[in-house]
Amino acid sequence: MTNTPQADLERRSRPARPRYRGLLMSVLAAVSLWAAGASAAERDEFFWLGEINKATAVINTDEGLLDRQLTPGIAAAIAKVIADGNKEGARRPSSVITFEPLLIKAGGMDVTLLHAGRSSQDMHATYRAAILRDDLLDLADQLNATARTLVELAAAHADTVVPNYTNGVAAQPNSFGHYLLGHAAGFARDAERIRQAYARIDRSAMGTTVLNGTGWPLNRQRMADYLGFAQLVDNAYDASQISSMDEPVEVGAVVTAIALHTGNFVEDIMTQYAGSRPWILLQEGGGNTYVSSAMPQKRNPGLLNSTRSDASTAVTLALGPILQTHNITPGMPDPKDVEQNTAMVEAGIKTLKDLDKVLKALVINRDRALEELNSDWTASQELADILMRKYAVPFREGHHFASGVVDYARQNDIKPLDFPYAEAQRIYAEAVAGTKYPQALPMAETEFRAALDPVAIVKARSTSGGPQPAEMERMIAKARAGLADQDAWIKERRGVIDAALARLDADFAKLTP
């Protein structure tokens, strides 16, 4: 047949030969097996461009936008490009304009019929969202693992009484488990931020073309379903011009929150190393600590240092999308770089892995913590609280009395458990002299001494959210339930994506007779 337009059309309209079909089926089988087993780590730009092309072939064929006679050849070209890219060391193009030439080489110019109503803008916005989506699930997974270590450590130390600090100064006695649950609550909010960010990122831009849609009647919802997206980006301009720019910024905010929470915890532990007899340290060796090259007595907290450094790196990378998005016109690629944004999330994951090691390496000396509490006046507020709660002495009057006790004790090097009751009576009388309140200290000596017992103070707390045993049990159970819910959410979201891609593989395989 001569090479006329009509002859070319006839050639393009012929069904695939049986020999060609067999080759196509083997390639399709290999591609489907790889796609079904592809982990999130392997779902790069090339992978998603392949999935988008597969979905386009299926949908447009079903809906009459692609000549069914041409579909087998186009499907074969898609399958070949994907199979070639999956080979060891093979080139894996990451943009539409570098992916498409491989399709043309494999299937001829007919393969560009796939590009009906498509653009690099919506295709790249889609794969960027898909990759960020996978990254967020990886981050959520590690956050949950680290938070679980934190919560279980809290359960193990529910009744361990230690000093807590404000402004870097010993403030009040507390349960170490309660302190840890406070940090766990911060990470629980980070988990919530991940879910919220995920919902905004889990939206398909496909079918929005450049910025105002297309004249082709594309089935956007079906495309979203095949790619595992929960929703569509509603506004076509928003899809690639606005949303794809603010998504990395939002993920950066999540990574920043996690890194800041990690850094706060690490620094609180780090201050203990400044003391000569810390009540909390890292287990020596095992990469947790290292010796000084010059000073034999030193055991430097290397793991704390590296965790803090990694948290700082995560914050640094997380600021990148913010700075890159500042003062540029809508749609510019500056903050959209997949490699940079994945590196940002991976920095957050590494920080959490480091923190997990820190938590597992902590050694708490309960006796030393109690000694620390009893060597200072962290329980002094309880004197003012009891005077007001039981004897109607206004808090500020009681505070003046307690402050006077502390001043006298420090001037005379007296520890709380050794403070003379007679001096307490004298200081109280001076504090309330000339007022309408009881002129004699209404607390008996036994009550005065019990008020200075840090263990009794912790157990006697009565408000919700406190460190008392009943509340600790409730909050630990709640934290565990939250972790279980988050695990289920992660599993569900991954399952939705995997199931969607499996359906796409199955339907793509049907494109050949």
Language model: regions and residue ranges:
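Bacterial N-terminal signal peptides
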Residues: 25-33
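Charged, flexible cofactor/metal-binding loops and thiol motifs
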Residues: 128-133, 137-144, 148, 155, ...
